[in-house]
Amino acid sequence: MIPKMDTEAYLDQLLGVGRFSSLKDGLYVLKLFSGVMVDIVMYMTVLRDGTVKTRVEVVNWGAIDNTVIHEETISRERACNIVRNQFYVASALTNVCRDFMEKAVGELSDIENSTVEGDIILDYQKVVSLGQFEVEVLYNSGGYECTLYPMYAEQQKFYTKDIDRVESFLSKMKKKYDATVKRVVEEELSKIGD
């Protein structure tokens, strides 16, 4: 059998396992993680020699550009094992989101108690997506309302006038979250062998 067709036959047998599906001949998609406005997806392209080129992207549904966080060419066996063991990656990413949400709640609670008053920007609006939750910041009658929207829990609201601290915190947290997600995806994929 031709190596490409052989690999496709193996992968076709796994269609429907978890969140693994086929887009077209030789192109497969594995949704590793579902977030509020952000998903983490692995695209698998079967090459002529039967190997599989993988590309993991953070798909941001609110923006046009996606971020590539991992690429490699792997064997057919390893591709099949990744599909079978996808839930380990999803579980690790869920733990990352939970940890970051706890940090966000703690920090926003601290900021809420701040007596510092920042600039007043009447039309201020900012939304930061961090996997399974989002933080929205709006100016509202003399202060800023920070609303945390988790996927699986009730929203939480925090009020502050210290917008500089909120912006600084959200910016640092987003960078740290992105770096952590990349590291965790690479670590979890490296654990899955042939």
Regions found by a protein language model. Give the residues of each.
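Intrinsically disordered, low-complexity regulatory segments enriched in Ser/Thr/Pro
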Residues: 38-85, 133-171
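Negatively charged, low-complexity tracts enriched in Asp/Glu with abundant Ser/Thr
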Residues: 1-37, 88-129, 189
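Residue-level detector of alpha-helical secondary structure
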Residues: 8-15, 76, 80, 84, ...
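Generic alpha-helical secondary structure signal
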Residues: 14, 24, 32, 47, ...
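Intrinsic disorder/low-complexity segments, especially N-terminal tails and targeting/processing regions
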Residues: 4, 48, 70, 113, ...
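Small side chains
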Residues: 18, 26, 72, 79, ...
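Generic structural motif
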Residues: 17-22, 36-42, 52-58, 106-118, ...
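Residue-level detector of intrinsically disordered/flexible regions characterized by low predicted structural confidence
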Residues: 6, 33, 55, 128, ...
